[in-house]
């Protein structure tokens, strides 16, 4: 069965809640001040390091802000690179070059011309995709031992100077590069080359908060004080509630403000989960949301994400799982004898090590006096899975929400 692109586009537009892809236009919520700040820094040549847990909307924020900036300033070009699937230094150079050429040149002819003009020290193989954007992929066959990869890192600056433009390079999941075997050398080279560029600015962002902070906050790191650090906050309920209520109304359905607030609080205003939970609730509501539907669809959210959570649990030791259960139960004194015995936390050195491991895995976040879960739905799922609250799931929803929200209300 063939579905024409216009029908598919209309079908997507008719769905009021979007997750799993970048939020655009009507689907993009608030972030007014964040957009303003991000554009202001990058417009004036200040590098930005954007940090927040996964699924908070960093990629959508950057994409929306940069599209606005390019409309406001025709002399600014933006290049977007996703580092999440880069596994070698050579792959990084190839993607970096492709991204820059793709971002600064609007036509296929310009792309090919720029390749010949600016990448003359290498012999690239070129793949041209048959799509409306005239996508280009470049394979430079760079050998970091024999070649000078600095030339690739200087590419956006050379193009910016030659064309009389400003270039902003946005690299998503930047911390993935720290997993490369050659990271230490690459890290030093990136900083050395990028800090000398005056027409190119960098926006580096990622969801592994612990790794991002290690790269940019440690005084011994080459990237220490590389740019302005922005910690993305949750979108406030003042924006979420009318968004949810209005989207239900526009599709002939209804949800009360108190129900919309309850939905948001259950997933702690996490952008991905608010959209996912709202979509499930909207798609299962004929006319009016009921409390039963609200509870049932929360369970669907937990069930839908269960495979991911099971994978994360499978990678943990029994004492680390015990630590998660203790944190989920609100415990703070992990070395107390009764707590150690109750949750099977092991020896003192294991407790210390497991705290560090769980933080490094971005499963929990350390505060002054306690720990909290990074992923709110993972916490709810964990409580359900291990029956931490000894009451029926339908009846315990409010208790779970109240308990898990207590550490987040300010």
Model-derived segments and their meaning:
Residues 241, 245-307, 318, 368:
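Amphipathic alpha-helical "lid/sensor" segments that cap RecA-like P-loop NTPase cores
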Residues 1-53, 68-74, 391, 395, ...:
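A short, basic N-terminal segment
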Residues 161-163, 167-170, 176-182, 189-220:
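Sensor-1/coupling segment of RecA-like P-loop NTPase cores
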Residues 53-56, 60-168, 200:
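P-loop NTPase nucleotide-binding core
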Residues 60, 198-249:
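Alpha-helical sensor/transducer elements of the RecA-like P-loop NTPase core
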Residues 45, 84-88, 176, 207-211, ...:
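Conserved nucleotide-binding/hydrolysis micro-motifs of P-loop NTPases
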Residues 68, 280, 357:
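Alpha-helical DNA-recognition elements
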Residues 2, 6-17, 161, 303, ...:
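C-terminal leucine-rich, beta-strand-based interaction scaffolds used for sensing/assembly
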